[in-house]
Amino acid sequence: AVVLPIKVGEGTMSKEIPLVILSSLVLFFCANDVMLDQGNENIIGRIDGLILLAFFLIFLRYTFAIARNGGEEVGEEQKIKEMPVWKSVLFIVGGLAGLIFGGQLFVEGASGIARSLGVSESVIGLTLVAGGTSLPELATSVTAALKKNPGIAIGNVIGSNLFNIFFVLGCSATISPLPMGGINNLDLTVMIASALLLWLVGWFFKKRTITRPEGVLMMVCYVAYTAYLIAQQ
């Protein structure tokens, strides 16, 4: 949004962003064994993992239904220049390979530096690792904004969040239960609040458009949260 104001489609506002809010709430309840079930520790167990995967299947069905109906109307300014299929496949494979290996090197290097400074693994995961694994989304969304394809920019972020919570965490927890460790309810609440902020900004402000000042506000909120995590160390 700082690069180029992002207009949010009606379907995104009424269905997809609420899905992100729902995914955050589902994760909050799945990860709160101590508060809700009087358990000994907060853990995302196998049953929780299956619940998350069930929501992922619902999300897939919704996505396929949209695809069959042709999706939202695309304005002239959002049309993407056609590219030969072979070239598209080549770009996808090459880009994925670069992102996978580059992201792995970034995360390993950043984690090594953080551990040498005595920073906890939960803070590493919430800041450096999260930032490193989000670089592909950042690059994709910024590029889409520069090419005036706001639907791709915001859809990339929403889809990534839903995929990570429902599928990645769902698969991981189903294979092996995931203790929450140093991640507490404040972190989960911040995640829910960020999704609500995106919905409120898009719905109540200027013509369902996330403007540059609002983009700056979101960045300031993230910097403040990161500073809080570091200060707690």
Question: For each predicted feature, which ranges?
Answer:
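Hydrophobic alpha-helical segments, chiefly the membrane-spanning helices
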Residues: 1-233
